[in-house]
Amino acid sequence: MRIMSIMLHLLATILLSSAVSAQNANAASTRRLIGEDRESGRRWGVAATDLGIPYDQHNGEIGFLFGDTVSTKWVQEAKDLRSPVMLRSGIHPGEDGGIVFESAAGVDGDGLAPRLFYNGDRGDDGTGTGTWEFTVLPNDGISFPETGEHIISYLSIMNFTTPWTPNYSGLAYSTDGNTFTRLPTKWLNNDNNTDPFQMWTMQRDGDWVYVFTVRSAPQYGPLMLQRVPWDKMTNKTEYQGWGWNGEDWGWQRPCSPILDGYFGEPSVRRLHDGTWAMVYLNASTSTPHIVSRSAKDPTGPWSEEKVQVNQEGDGSLLYGGFIHPWSTSKGNQLYLMVSNWTSTSNLSQTTEAVADYEGTVSVSQFTGTL
């Protein structure tokens, strides 16, 4: 059985024997969003999935991007496997009860939420190059109210080695936020599997979109920063690196690391008060945790890490931590989407056997303070 996401492989490597307390963690679970018993499962067949990356649709709604998705609770009984899919909600996460999904991309009313764009699904990636593609997973999304266009950054996965191996990161484009087309624009992984432009998070500020990227996991590496004019995102030559030349920092240079670490998927959002927030899984030890940082500018300096979510110590695996765009820097107004893999099989088996695990995976809303 295929796993639910790349992060399961990362966490299987570093968490299988961990028993971690939740002390010193700031964010607390508010509501489980995914399941057969939730709107996601009952209305759109999104009963087990992960990620739930939220991005602003600029129409009063937030789109949530999910990875490998099935319409059954238990992965070993998987039906209707597809990735990526999108659910939407205009409900503020601070309201009583938290987020409730109200619609799905690509379907009117109720019905099976379809995948958003082509996925090779253990086959050809569709580029005509004969590239093998195990699956496609979303990195982040962004929309532009001036044109109504949406762009999703995605990851083409070749295989789930340790660390797992992407073919490339790429962009998918939509004029309506419902159906997307993969573009030729892509950032190829290198032969050493160390390219630092594979996992993306994107945030617009004025005329620029700031793109933060890391390499595939689990491996130590840099976090890089680029920017691109918002209306030229599909043109790789328009991307400007933020780099150090030995004397000072500046744009239009080869990228230099703004941070180093064992990063899971990064999430960066500019909050309404101008604060920049960053959240990611710090996988540097046998007790990884979801942490946050803040800054006044995308270039930094970034604050020290603040622990938001620790593992629960009950055999489940928590990962993600994607920032809801309506979060603020005020107390208890940092809203995070956190994935939870719960296995019903032997978690002490090798990483290579993770694909044989049995269990379920869901996404919950956590609420904390930046």
Swiss-Prot record:
Q: Which SUPFAM superfamilies match?
A: Arabinanase/levansucrase/invertase
Q: How is it used?
A: Notoamides have been shown to exhibit antitumoral activities. Notoamides A-C show moderate cytotoxicity against HeLa and L1210 cells with IC(50) values in the range of 22-52 mg/ml, but the IC(50) value of notoamide D is greater than 100 mg/ml. Moreover, notoamide C induces G2/M-cell cycle arrest at a concentration of 6.3 mg/ml.
Any stretches that span the bilayer, and where are they?
none
InterPro entries in alphabetical order: DUF4185, Glyco_hydro_beta-prop_sf
Glycosylation sites noted in the Swiss-Prot or TrEMBL record: 159, 167, 192, 235, 282, 340, 346
Position of the signal peptide: 1-22
Keywords associated with the record = Glycoprotein, Signal
Q: What does this protein do?
A: Part of the gene cluster that mediates the biosynthesis of notoamide, a fungal indole alkaloid that belongs to a family of natural products containing a characteristic bicyclo[2.2.2]diazaoctane core. The first step of notoamide biosynthesis involves coupling of L-proline and L-tryptophan by the bimodular NRPS notE, to produce cyclo-L-tryptophan-L-proline called brevianamide F.
What protein is this chain from?
Notoamide biosynthesis cluster protein J
What organism is recorded for this protein?
A: Aspergillus sp. (strain MF297-2)
